[in-house]
Amino acid sequence: MGTMPEKKTLTVQRVLALVIAYITLSVGGGVAASLFLLPAVFGANSVAKAVIPSLSVEGIDFDVTSLPQKSTMYASDGTTKITEFWDQNREVVPLKKISKYMQQAVVAREDRRFFTHGGVDVQGVFRAFVQTYMKGDHQGGSSLTQQYVKNVLILQAQQDDDPIAQYHASEDTIARKVREMLISVQMEKQYSKPEILQGYLNIAQFGGNSLYGVQAAAKRYFNTTADQLNIVQSATIAAITKNPNAYDPSVESNQPESEKQRNIVLQLMNEQGYISDAEYQEAVNTPLADTLDVQPISTGCMAADYDAGYFCDYVVHKILNSKEFGKTSEDRERLLKEGGLKIVTTLDIDANTLLNETARNTIPPEDSSGMEIVMASVKPGTGEVLGFGLNRTYDATEAAQNDQTRDSMNYAVDREDGGGMGFSIGSSWKPVNLVAWMEAGHSVNENLQTSTRYSTSLFACDRYTGGTDTWNVTNAITNGTVNPETPALGLARSHNTTQASMGSIIGLCKIADTATELGYHDANTGETLDKTSSFVPAMMVGNVNVSPLTMASIFAVYASNGVQCDPIALKQVTDVDGNDIKVPSANCHQTVDPEIIQTLAWAINQSVVRSDGAGGVAQLANGRKTFAKTGTHEDQLVTTGGFIPNQIATFVLVGDVQNPVGHPIANIAINGQYHSYWDGSTIAAPAWRDFMNAYAERKQLPIDNDYGQPAAKYSATSSTVTKIGGGKQNATQQQSTIIQQQNQSLQQQSQQNDQQDDQDQQQTEDE
């Protein structure tokens, strides 16, 4: 950072030289002649060398319409505002959309000879000189054009992050005054008076909290627009620029002085013929407080309406991560806060509201369990993210770090989008396996040999060597095997052993490839399944790293007859001139055979309607055919995913998302209800059901009970049994094999018990 030049003492000689420079600019030789006076103004020393370069007008953006403007985020209807983003709260409007009273009030207050001088007000300079240096009463002599120039220079220095330029643009120095004169004269030659007035009315500060421009001021103080400002309102706003923080009328303690300053402006307007005596009297007799309708300031995701803080944060991350909005993250952030964007998102206000209500009703934020619930919903066939539900309030402040009810991390999304590292989801994953199974040419009603012990070599494929380890598999409900069992029944009963048998036949690579087709990627790294540490047999029972949003998107494929779409949060973004900015595409495409999807939907529904199914509690109201799959990852996380065909897909996850291993969801009371064992059906499925019922009722979603008709080629039955690893045998051979396996298993278990007894005995002897 450069050293600021020392402020030069104002001697009488230098003040006189400055006055002559003003006169020369305004009357005689213009810019060129004024340069001969600069040595007298600055002096010929090292300070001058630091100051004089700042007098150059090259590289200054004179465009009176090019100003930083706030961006506004909207819900999917394009009209419901969610929040705004700005460094300077400004909304540029043309002069024709600013009331004549507002224009007149500013001219009366700041520069009564604005329409007659050439950029520098000679009379104003002499008046200021006399008042300041002869009577000791500091007076400003800058014309309205000069004030506009000053604001432009300050703004450009801020945007360039140039502290030296900021010093020259804002410090009370002779250099600044002369430079403003030079530029003002040039501006008056390039732009008309109305254009300069428009620029000033849009750039000037009209209050605290970074409030700039008359449009933002009109909305803030009077809940109106600049073109509707009346005499009293205009005078109030015009008075603020002299001291934006002290005269801000939204601050109650400022109001007496603000009213006094307003009345001064009204008097000037009357003296200069802008308002009549009667209008003046009526205006000054109007109490300021009676005219105000102060609106709250809204900026950033913490100010988002409709409980959309987490959704807003997701959108911001999408903008900052998308090259469509700039080359670098810094460029994209500047565009967001200064570009005047209209951001139309995919947010469904009803969905988002109901998601959050359901989340907090299921587990209150202050619940002693400390458990969290995370929900995400997607519109099938579009990729549109409808909303998120968390039993936390979005809060990006440091105070939230010690408050379990508040958080800024959206655990529903990937790490790069402001979320976590992903979660294991248990049996909610199993429909992926079934899609892969059918894509490999198999039927969901094929009889499979199952076991509780599998050699990892059985799952080998071109990207997985398998090895010689043993994978021990159990079923949470039966704690054993059903042998033989079909993939459809294995899904309905949520049996892990059947998933393992399927994997031994088609291999892990096929399942990983299908997961990629459906839209799976690692929440932490973004990699496909076969490129992560999750690429092991346990992935078939949901040991993966996936976000709830990704799972909602996968269930959306099941809900849209096999159309896969990437999640999107942006429908349309336009710049300040109304031009469309390209937004990330959902890349929707047919990825799975519709007959496979229909068969899968039938199988998922069996989980709900069968008496031995794992998802009966998810049944929706009004006889609506229900498609939901529960899941439990050990005793750490419980889940449910499901959909209403072609309408909505939702995924729910419950647990301590920050410490699932250290804080299991077992032997614990949640919202006053105790269970020694929690699973997807005890809390995640009821939450899913409650939300889906509420959303279906709110939106009056049609009932489509024809969805989920199994295709013959994927649901054919067979009298043979497919062995583990492939191959066929008849039912009699299968039963014999089962008895042999059971005897072998019992013998192995007996040997293991004997070995453990020997170890225990040895340990006792050692002690």
What are these regions (language model features)?
Residues 134-158, 297-302, 442-511, 536, ...:
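Conserved catalytic neighborhood of penicillin-recognizing serine enzymes
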Residues 67-276, 492-496, 503-507, 519-521:
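Peptidoglycan glycan-strand catalytic modules in the bacterial/periplasmic cell-wall system
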